[in-house]
A protein has these predicted regions:
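Accessory carbohydrate-recognition regions in carbohydrate-active enzymes
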Residues: 1-169
Length: 169
């Protein structure tokens, strides 16, 4: 999950100002599970994973449009190249070439409306917006990773999480 920083967001954001505060009293962690309430966005974020996949579950306020910010343009080691693209109505994929080249394949339970880029000086982020996303149903992202190819990232996702719920993972 380190190579693909994903942050659930709402409202207007910029590539230079999107961090959220949180309280340790609204955070919990145990092996295989992490949860935090993001105060700025009013989102409860839950994460779990398998060996080569991540499962994100974001519970937004019912009146908020659901979006995620994907920040693959920087790492501790510097990014040489990156890409993110919509594959189909529910899927996006891409890569980040930093110290190694990691590919990802992400499937959402909401239809993807668009993926747009926000740039502030030299820093650029991607914002994935979801269609008809208001309501209490959480946004769930299943993300497969591979150092070989996007096809392998998809295969890893299908092998490790295909029909599993968040609780099953």
């Amino acid at each position: 999950m380190l190579h693909l920083p994903v942050l659930p967001v709402t409202g207007n954001i910029s590539s230079g100002d999107y961090a959220s505060t949180y309280s340790h009293s609204n955070e919990s962690a145990r092996p295989g599970y992490y949860q935090v309430f993001l105060e700025r966005y009013g989102v409860n974020a839950e994460l779990t994973s398998t060996l080569r996949c991540a499962y994100h579950k974001y519970t937004f306020r019912p009146d908020d449009d659901k979006k995620v910010l994907v920040d693959i343009t920087r790492t501790n080691n510097g990014v040489r190249d990156w890409s993110i693209q919509k594959v189909d109505d529910y899927t996006f994929s891409g890569n980040q070439d930093a110290e190694g080249n990691i590919r990802f394949y992400a499937v959402s339970n909401y239809k993807i409306e668009d993926i747009r880029q926000l740039k502030n000086g030299e820093h650029e982020v991607s914002v994935v917006s979801f269609a008809d996303s208001k309501g209490s149903k959480p946004l769930e992202l299943k993300i497969g990773f591979s150092f070989v190819s996007i096809d392998n990232a998809k295969m890893n996702l299908e092998q490790e999480m295909k029909d599993k719920s968040f609780a099953q993972v």
